[in-house]
A protein has these predicted regions:
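Small/aliphatic-rich secondary-structure junction motif
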Residues: 1-47, 71, 132, 141-181, ...
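Short, surface-exposed alpha-helical segments at coil->helix boundaries
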Residues: 48-60, 157
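Charged docking surfaces used in two-component/phosphorelay signaling
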Residues: 76-84
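Glycine-rich, Arg-bearing micro-motifs that act as flexible, cationic patches
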Residues: 99-118, 184-207, 217-225
Length: 231
């Protein structure tokens, strides 16, 4: 079964970084869904139709960037982007929500925006964050995957090993150079099935120079290598 993955997309440059990361996850067996959250409905019917059509066009452009025009797309109406994405993830049975970094992030750095930060505090779905300007890479591979040495949740190494195609003992550490993805587990005090970072993991997220995937406590993600990615 593929790993259903929602990409939060609003047409901004940094959300194209999220598309780039989503495409790399697709090469590992993820099935992608694009989502845009509208915060208010228009009181006038004509304006509401126009707003809905504009949101649909925006998501269509995102699917075009992915070179996958049949990618499922959802326009969500919610006062909170984080809440709207959380509810969509629960409804769709998604395992991951992917974000770009905050709009003011320096190239190559990772900085979760407000919505990502909210999901990182207790959401029942894994969260992935792309570094700024990831979209500029011709290809994003996930060959060199790192985990923190002190991560106590076994699902972290399990998931990272599947992504990298190596045994857990061969995974990189965050200090290693040329990392393609950092996988972080949720802290020991986190409710099972939810996301929650320890202070140490939060620091690793803030200093990361690669995409970051934060897993739910006790929940591994069963990625698969697609034939196209290994041929």
């Amino acid at each position: 079964m593929s790993v259903k993955t929602i990409i939060s997309y609003d047409g901004t440059a940094n959300d194209r970084d999220a598309l780039a990361l989503g495409r790399a996850l697709r090469d590992r067996g993820a099935s992608l869904v694009l989502a845009y959250v509208r915060h208010t409905a228009e009181s006038d019917d004509a304006r509401e139709r126009a707003a809905q059509e504009e949101a649909s066009r925006l998501l269509e452009d995102g699917a075009g960037w992915l070179e996958a025009p049949d990618t499922p797309r959802h326009v969500v109406l919610s006062g909170s982007t984080a809440q709207g994405l959380r509810e969509l993830a629960e409804h769709e049975g998604a395992e991951i929500v992917v974000f770009g970094s905050d709009a003011h992030t320096a190239p190559g750095h990772v900085a979760p925006g407000t919505s990502a930060q909210r999901l990182l505090r207790g959401a029942p779905v894994a969260v992935a964050i792309a570094p700024a300007r990831l979209r500029d890479r011709e290809r994003v591979d996930l060959e060199h995957v790192a985990v923190a040495g002190g991560d106590s949740d076994p699902v972290t190494r399990e998931t990272a090993g599947v992504l990298a195609g190596v045994g857990a003992e061969h995974l990189a550490t965050p200090a290693a150079g040329s990392i393609d993805l950092l996988v972080l587990g949720s802290g020991p005090g986190t409710i099972d099935g939810h996301v929650g970072l320890s202070a140490a993991s939060d620091y690793l997220l803030e200093t990361a120079r690669s995409p970051v995937l934060v897993l739910r406590r006790g929940v591994a993600i069963a990625f698969e290598r697609m034939l196209a990615a290994t041929s």
